[in-house]
Curated annotation (Swiss-Prot):
Subunit details: Homotetramer.
Binding site for Mg(2+): D74, E143
Taxonomic placement: Bacteria, Pseudomonadati, Pseudomonadota, Gammaproteobacteria, Thiotrichales
InterPro entries the UniProt entry points to: Class_I_gatase-like, CTP_synthase, CTP_synthase_N, GATASE, GATase1_CTP_Synthase, P-loop_NTPase
Protein name: CTP synthase
Region described as Amidoligase domain: spans on this chain: 1-269
Annotated gene: pyrG
Residues annotated for CTP binding in this entry: S16, D150, I151, E152, K190, T191, K192, P193, T194, Q195, K226
Catalytic activity field: UTP + L-glutamine + ATP + H2O = CTP + L-glutamate + ADP + phosphate + 2 H(+); L-glutamine + H2O = L-glutamate + NH4(+); UTP + NH4(+) + ATP = CTP + ADP + phosphate + 2 H(+)
Binding-site list for ATP: S17, L18, G19, K20, G21, V22, D74
More info: CTPSs have evolved a hybrid strategy for distinguishing between UTP and CTP. The overlapping regions of the product feedback inhibitory and substrate sites recognize a common feature in both compounds, the triphosphate moiety. To differentiate isosteric substrate and product pyrimidine rings, an additional pocket far from the expected kinase/ligase catalytic site, specifically recognizes the cytosine and ribose portions of the product inhibitor.
Gene3D superfamilies referenced in this protein's UniProt entry, alphabetically: 3.40.50.880, P-loop containing nucleotide triphosphate hydrolases
Length: 546
């Protein structure tokens, strides 16, 4: 971080899930539209080292960065809103901070000192914030996870309080997001929760510079005056975060209120006028959709749609590009069997099986894949979805009835999917893994090149000889079965650069049947979409019309 970089800290109060991530990303979008180089960071107060081993039903999606970090789903928002790509430096947790401090303590780096939250933990938080910001960055927006008042968040709040003192008011800004409940029976907006949230923040030693008030409806100047009086925040630094039809409207709403202009003023930024024409085009495209197409997503985390956040957004973005609204029908794979499979898919235009781990619900996914293959329904498989598509093909086309994955059935005699014991990273380093290795951080993670087969549908879709997609898996197609699968009509249309790992499959006789080992949803954005998803949605539209 250079001596001119400004930092905006975004905190949240009253309740969680107010949309801190979207607010932070929207502010970054606005500043980027003014010609500034903006990066973002998420600080998570949980004690896990990273979210890699956490249940998606508790934490939501694990977003994978290009350099292979398993991170919070908010980093997905960041990449969809701004152009800069996130790295492992853009997200860290309490667990990671303590891990670093304790490792140094074991090495004797603290020279026998008593290790305490202050200064050792807070110093490590400050170090990670400052070292994670590149020298060419004009503004860094740092989101503090959790809610003010949570015991877990206190070391992070203390660290940013200290950074305000060390860097000065001209280089730091505190933006606090709170809730203004609207009581319909009384027809009133209540400001008391916001007052108490700001008071709680002040008790920690932080005075909010800007307030963002989440509310169902706009509030008038009388409410603003009341909030300003009791929170010690200037009235012109209080903004509304009202409910919108799509999160991509949020930057435009903030711009209309003059939010970005106020940030430029408060931080004395050398910025040009905002050019939001590209972002306005995104919103116009969303508003202009005419038709609707229904996609069945067959998974085991469907009770929490946040578990598939990037995938949902990739489907929606592809739909916008094709002029349709994508409706996702979430199907719990545990409920699907041979007797009821048709009832789940008779009204859908396409079927998708996403990534996942573990054996629960696997047979329901395989039955769904078989139904898509046999009934010429456009199908997209991702990660585990590709592995199960290979298993289904081996069972029902090759006739290997006990074909399985050694992850799901360790004693299977025909492991068409097996553990990757060794692979080479993009930088040339060789990674190795065994069945006894730790689960956390030991997968094939991050961006890897995939070489596309000439004449394949995948090559036609991507319009490239090779692509880079992000991975998060331990298991791959067993190379011992590849030749037999190809002879039976399955095409491996994408392979790793060294030709050892199978990355893409397709069935040429099928209307649209593609599965990939990578997670292409992580690189889809509302500005640019993603070619694979757009082709998939186009196939769904054509199938729906027929």
């Amino acid at each position: 971080m250079n001596s001119n970089t400004k930092i905006i800290f975004v905190t949240g109060g009253v309740v969680s899930s107010l949309g801190k991530g979207v607010t932070a990303a929207s502010l970054a979008t606005l500043l980027e539209s003014r010609g500034l180089n903006v990066t973002m960071m998420k600080l998570d107060p949980y004690i896990n080292v990273d979210p890699g081993t956490m249940s998606p039903l508790q934490h939501g999606e694990v977003f994978v960065t290009e350099d292979g970090a398993e991170t919070d789903l908010d980093l997905g928002h960041y990449e969809r809103f701004i152009r800069n790509k996130m790295t492992q430096a853009n997200n860290f947790t309490t667990g990671k901070v303590y891990q670093s401090v304790l490792r140094r303590e074991r090495k004797g780096d603290y020279l026998g000192a008593t290790i305490q939250v202050i200064p050792h933990i807070t110093d490590e938080i400050k170090r990670r914030i400052c070292s994670g910001i590149a020298d060419d960055v004009d503004v860094a927006i740092v989101e503090i996870g959790g809610t003010v008042g949570d015991i877990e968040s206190q070391p992070f709040l203390e660290a940013i309080r200290q950074l305000r003192i060390e860097l000065g008011r001209n280089r730091t800004l505190f933006v606090h997001l709170t809730l203004l409940p609207y009581i319909k029976v009384a027809g009133e907006i209540k400001t008391k929760p916001t007052q108490h949230s700001v008071k709680e923040l002040r008790g920690i030693g932080i005075q909010a510079d800007v307030l963002v008030c989440r509310c169902e409806k706009k509030f008038d100047d009388s409410e603003k005056r009341k909030i300003a009086l009791f929170t010690n925040v200037d009235q012109d630094c209080i903004f509304t975060a009202e409910d919108v039809d799509t999160i991509y409207e949020v930057p435009l709403k903030y711009n209309q209120q003059g939010f970005d202009a106020k940030l430029v003023e408060l931080l004395n930024l050398n910025a040009k006028e905002a050019d939001l024409s590209e972002w306005q085009n995104v919103v116009n495209t969303i508003r202009d959709v005419k038709g609707e197409v229904t996609i069945a997503m067959v998974g085991k985390y469907v009770s929490l749609t946040e578990a598939y956040k990037s995938l949902n957004e990739a489907l929606y973005n592809a739909g916008y590009k094709k002029g349709v609204k994508v409706k996702i029908k979430f199907v719990d794979s545990e409920d699907v069997n041979e007797n009821n499979v048709e009832s789940y898919f008779k009204d859908v235009a396409a079927i998708l099986v996403p990534g996942g781990f573990g054996s629960r619900g696997v047979e329901g996914k395989i039955i769904s894949i078989k139904y898509a293959r046999e009934n010429q329904i456009p199908f997209l498989g991702i990660c585990l979805g590709m592995q199960l598509a290979v298993i289904e093909y081996a069972r029902n086309i090759l006739g290997i009835k006990d074909a399985h994955s050694s992850e799901l059935e360790p004693t299977t005699a025909n492991p068409v999917i097996g553990l990757i014991t060794e692979w080479q990273a993009e930088d040339g380093t060789v990674h190795q893994r065994t069945h006894s290795s730790d689960l956390g951080g030991t997968m094939r993670l991050g961006g890897y090149k995939c070489v596309l087969k000439q004449g394949s549908r995948a090559r036609e879709i991507y319009q490239a000889d090779e692509v880079v997609e992000r991975h998060r898996h331990r298991y791959e197609v067993n190379s011992n079965y590849v030749e037999r699968l190809e002879e039976a009509g399955l095409i491996f249309s994408g392979r790793s650069e060294d030709n050892k790992l199978m990355e893409l499959i397709e069935i040429p006789q099928h209307k649209w049947f593609i599965a990939c080992q990578a997670h292409p949803e992580f690189t889809s954005t509302p500005r640019y979409g993603h070619k694979l998803f757009e082709s998939y949605i186009q196939a769904a539209i054509e199938n729906s019309n027929n």
